[in-house]
């Protein structure tokens, strides 16, 4: 993050994955994992490789006062305001790069080619809304899929402490 003036914060994020060149198109063995395909066939007991570019995003937050912020975010690819943060975007996953078993079912939007989010934080509450491309990336892990902005989501969060977030 970089300060912009006295009340602004600008952020650029990039995340790359070397899954595809290292592991091949059908990924790596992971018992009980399912939910993806390779060359039209379901991957069973395997984790698919992620796209080379898992996130390229920019965000800006502006403090109106100590209790109120407004913010915007654009990702191509990025992550919309839908559910909890996907495993690969959490700081806690830094030393555990394997996908959890529920990854395909709970983190379906973690690499979304086209995300625009705006939101407001008031004290411990935050509401944000996203328009995004509502589909998984295609099987070509090196390209940028077409942005469609055909899905929408709203997320309300409450943070009673700095270590706890409820949605």
Please identify what each model-predicted range represents.
Residues 16-22, 62, 74-80, 122-124, ...:
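Transmembrane beta-strands of outer-membrane beta-barrel pores
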Residues 2-4, 60-62, 119-122, 157-160:
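Residue-level signature of outer-membrane beta-barrel architecture
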Residues 125-167:
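Loop-centered beta-sheet repeat module
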């Amino acid at each position: 993050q970089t300060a912009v003036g006295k009340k602004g914060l600008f952020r650029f994020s990039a995340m790359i994955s070397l899954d595809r060149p290292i592991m091949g198109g059908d990924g790596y063995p992971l018992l009980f994992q399912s939910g993806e395909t390779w060359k039209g066939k379901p991957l069973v007991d395997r984790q698919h490789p992620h796209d080379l570019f898992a996130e390229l995003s920019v965000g800006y937050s502006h403090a109106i006062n100590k209790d109120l912020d407004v913010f915007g975010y654009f990702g191509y690819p990025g992550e919309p305001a839908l559910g909890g943060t996907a495993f690969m975007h959490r700081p806690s996953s830094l030393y555990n790069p394997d996908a959890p078993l529920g990854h395909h079912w709970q983190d379906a939007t973690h690499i979304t080619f086209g995300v625009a989010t705006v939101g407001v934080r008031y004290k411990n509450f935050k509401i944000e809304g996203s328009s995004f491309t509502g589909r998984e990336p295609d099987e070509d892990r090196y390209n940028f899929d077409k942005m469609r902005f055909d899905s929408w989501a709203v997320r309300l969060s409450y943070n009673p402490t700095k270590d706890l977030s409820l949605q």
